[in-house]
């Protein structure tokens, strides 16, 4: 089996990401009282940073075995893709990395109304080509695995409110 030597990403100097917004959850909240009703939300609850490696030759994933498969991946910081020490496992399976923002917000439902509350999450989505360099520890033979890294990283949230009655 081969071991990972290093990985190189090809398009980090470009603004090669885009922002995408997804509805995370939506619910109806009635308020039959004569005062505002406080509704506490955790917008990032069950939100993850999703990462997936695709190889041009998927069978090459098996060259690496199951141990020591950690590589660094880029993320978006200050509006640019850059390396910042974030480590993930090099695998063909989609990974859901914890997103540790526990922020809570309070939404007030006005008296005698019913509102639909929708939590929208904005993600930084990007794809970048990579070359992973591996070496056989006994023979010194080198292999290069080319592919694409896909990443969907939470960036912001928005709350929409619609009066139903």
Question: Predicted segment positions?
Answer:
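Core pore-forming/fusogenic effector modules of secreted, proteolytically activated toxins
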Residues: 1-60, 88-165
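Polybasic, Ser/Thr-rich amphipathic helices
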Residues: 62-91
């Amino acid at each position: 089996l081969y071991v990972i030597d290093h990985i190189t990403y090809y398009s980090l100097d470009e603004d090669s990401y885009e922002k995408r917004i997804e509805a995370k959850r939506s619910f109806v909240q009635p308020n039959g009282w004569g005062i505002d009703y406080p509704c506490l939300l955790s917008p990032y609850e069950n939100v993850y940073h999703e990462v997936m490696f695709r190889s041009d030759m998927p069978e090459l994933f098996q060259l690496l075995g199951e141990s020591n498969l950690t590589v660094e991946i880029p993320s978006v910081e200050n509006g640019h893709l850059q390396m910042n020490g974030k480590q993930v496992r090099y695998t063909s399976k989609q990974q859901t990395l914890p997103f540790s923002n526990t922020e809570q917000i309070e939404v007030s439902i006005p008296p005698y109304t019913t509102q639909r509350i929708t939590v929208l999450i904005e993600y930084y989505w990007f794809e970048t080509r990579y070359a992973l360099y591996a070496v056989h520890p006994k023979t010194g033979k080198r292999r290069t695995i080319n592919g694409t890294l896909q990443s969907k990283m939470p960036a912001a949230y928005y709350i929409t409110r619609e009066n139903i009655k």
